[in-house]
């Protein structure tokens, strides 16, 4: 039975056992199921072994031992992500960055083969990737914070600002600052209500926030210049 977690029964449903807690995925994505289970399928392989395939919001898993253990098939080479946003560097080496649904911020930096593999840097939902320096640094949003990678091709963790505003979208749009790549404009929301454009600027290992004076009548859904 699938929900947020997956449960199994080996006695015709008289008792149930949770395969793993959703949060255990972050300790070892290769052997723990990701949260949210939309489908489970039983199949036999060519040797007659019953295989169980589990679809999750973080990829596809299989098990050959009645879910005593699972293996993540999506960590290497299998493209199963749903992308909210992508950004491609405009000059060689043409690295690609992506914000995905539940499979986090990803990047593809090795293009020696015709098929590009992507590395998942962090899990979660990321969108509206933006850069003011042609992809050297990347801004992104998550439901609850904005994040900045000063060196997007190598940084493991980003600098974040938790949303201290109301009235914004679930993934509020971003727009790069054409003069300062360490700054970005975010569609609010407002720090004290209303709907304003916020300017986020990296300040060391933190992010400074300045709210525009003009108040819009409704939620801001898009920005461009």
Outline where the language-model segments fall.
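Beta-propeller blade termini and top-face loops
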Residues: 1-225
């Amino acid at each position: 039975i699938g929900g947020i977690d997956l449960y199994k029964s080996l006695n015709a449903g008289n008792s149930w056992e949770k395969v793993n807690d959703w949060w255990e995925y972050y300790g070892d994505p290769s052997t723990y199921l990701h949260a949210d289970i939309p489908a489970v399928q039983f199949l036999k392989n060519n040797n007659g072994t019953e295989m169980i395939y589990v679809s999750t919001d973080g990829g596809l898993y299989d098990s050959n031992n009645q879910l005593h253990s699972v293996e993540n098939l999506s960590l290497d080479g299998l493209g199963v992500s749903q992308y909210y946003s992508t950004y491609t560097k405009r000059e060689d080496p043409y690295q690609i960055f992506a914000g995905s649904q539940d499979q986090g911020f990803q990047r593809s930096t090795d293009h020696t083969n015709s098929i590009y593999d992507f590395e998942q840097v962090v899990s979660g939902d990321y969108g509206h990737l933006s850069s003011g320096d042609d992809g050297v640094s990347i801004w992104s949003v998550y439901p609850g914070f904005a994040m900045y990678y000063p060196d997007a091709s190598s940084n493991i963790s980003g600098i974040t600002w938790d949303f201290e505003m109301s009235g914004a979208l679930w993934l509020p749009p971003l727009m790069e600052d054409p003069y300062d790549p360490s700054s970005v404009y975010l569609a609010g929301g407002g720090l004290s209500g209303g709907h304003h454009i916020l300017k986020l600027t990296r300040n060391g290992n933190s992010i400074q926030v300045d709210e525009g004076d003009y108040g819009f009548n409704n939620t801001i859904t898009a920005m461009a210049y």
